[in-house]
Amino acid sequence: MYPSCRPRTPLPRPCMTFIATISWSAEAPVDTPVERSGKAVVSQHFGRAARSYDEHAVLQLAVGRSLVQRLPEALPINHALDLGCATAPFARAQQQALPDVQWQAVDLSSAMLAEAAERGRLDETYQPLCADAENLPLSTNSQGLVFSCFALQWCDPQVVMAEINRVLAPGGRLLLAVPLAGSLAELQSSWQRVNHRPHVNALPSLADWRSAAFQAGFADAQLQQQVMVEYYDSVKAIARRLKATGADHVSGASGLTGKNAWQAMVKEYEARRTQQGLPLTWNVLFLEAEKS
């Protein structure tokens, strides 16, 4: 039996501004090494955020709704994955868009899948699968669609794109949205002025994903980068929002942040305040591809 949900006091929702769109196509690879964090730790962080995720993942949900609008009208095989589904917030919209498709809600965190079940989003046509996106327990050429929103930034782009290509059937589609290097730039810069410890994860770049798509065989992949800015009332609100969505895990970080260091960082961040509030920038990649 899954634990019951307890009512929570929601954080104030940030304002969000769309800044720009830049588009690319897949091309010859660029060799850019990217470090990865331990998956067990990532799973634990997201598991702890399962109860609070839906209430606080404002940007993630907005990006996901945009991704749902890009769903194709038909698939070569009526099987699809929501890869890194979290609490499966897009389940109903996905089922409405593709009513004849059998979905699997895939996540590394069993707690996220339990929360999805608690919220009534899993059924006989939308079933859970606790699995690693880089090593899926699925047959080759078995899926007509892979949908993934704000989940694969923890993966090695080369490995996960090859695995996605493996499970997709010929003519199968990939719809991916993922934060890129340069996201949370204000937070990273403010911390760098205080100390050189890692406080923000080093995310893969657009070049990393473009190279991975090319290497995996998605020669005609379309990549579009959008810059989005959220505005918050305080640095504390930013930190609480990241923790509430499981995005507070930082690879290589150790120990607690001291009060003096925190206050110094807050002072640096406050210098960035605008009339709208404290900005937090996200670079978001939208990637669409078809397996040949």
Swiss-Prot record:
It catalyses: malonyl-[ACP] + S-adenosyl-L-methionine = malonyl-[ACP] methyl ester + S-adenosyl-L-homocysteine. Its EC number is 2.1.1.197. InterPro entries: BioC, Malonyl-ACP_OMT, Methyltransf_11, SAM-dependent_MTases_sf. It is an enzyme of class 2 (transferase). PANTHER family: ARGININE-HYDROXYLASE NDUFAF5, MITOCHONDRIAL. Pfam families: Methyltransf_11. GO terms for molecular function: carboxyl-O-methyltransferase activity; malonyl-CoA methyltransferase activity; S-adenosylmethionine-dependent methyltransferase activity. Converts the free carboxyl group of a malonyl-thioester to its methyl ester by transfer of a methyl group from S-adenosyl-L-methionine (SAM). It allows to synthesize pimeloyl-ACP via the fatty acid synthetic pathway. GO terms for biological process: biotin biosynthetic process; methylation. This is Malonyl-[acyl-carrier protein] O-methyltransferase. Keywords: Biotin biosynthesis, Methyltransferase, S-adenosyl-L-methionine, Transferase. It comes from Alcanivorax borkumensis (strain ATCC 700651 / DSM 11573 / NCIMB 13689 / SK2). Belongs to the methyltransferase superfamily. Transmembrane segments: none annotated. It comes from the Bacteria. Pathway: Cofactor biosynthesis; biotin biosynthesis.
